[in-house]
Amino acid sequence: MIDLAILIILSLCVLAGYYRGTIYAAINTGVTVLALLIALLMIPAAAGVIKHSDRLYKGMLYYFEGYEYVSATSVEQVHTPANAVSDGDLKTIVNNANMPIPMGDAVQKNIRRLAYQEKGIVTLGDYFNQTIVDVVINILSMFGIFVVLRLIMGWTLRIIDSSFEGFPVMNRYDAVFSCGIGFLHGVLLVYTLFLLVPVALTVVPRLETFLNESLLGGFFYHVNPLLHLIPMT
């Protein structure tokens, strides 16, 4: 099912590229890249709005339980001070937790540099919980900003295209280049959609079973460069 959905998205992007031509397809892909870059830069501002809403932020801290990831190794470790955990023990705890990407790496880095010390966060369980919530907020912020920007930019591009009665088309190999660019655009869009996978897995861990059964889904999740650009705090 996941593979089919991905193939449909890629096919639609290839067809759109073929129909619109190489120049339009290239500009359209560039617009998506630009929207992603702006969304990435605006994460701190957007996430800050959510974090300054005590009711919403505390609600998320309550809902996204990070303690259970620690208890997968030992319940007693939940209340262990983060600075008292060795690198080896921390690696074991994170491996046993089987956390969504990039939660595991984010937790390890935040604990090693005591990122939340100024907030009074001390225990291992609280570090897991806080990191998960912050990463989720950052992902949702980036995705939401991207969607809004992409819709506005796409609508603007359509108006420009209509005003000039379409962008020029290459005399030779236009179909080949336009389809290729359309495919790359589709890959980029799928990567963007898969930003939501860690959030979904945090809420419903059993979804990982369906993801592991998907060849394309597993690829776009495990080999997703966008996930590693998400801020850790």
State each model region's role:
Residues 1-233:
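Alpha-helical transmembrane segments and their juxtamembrane interface "caps"
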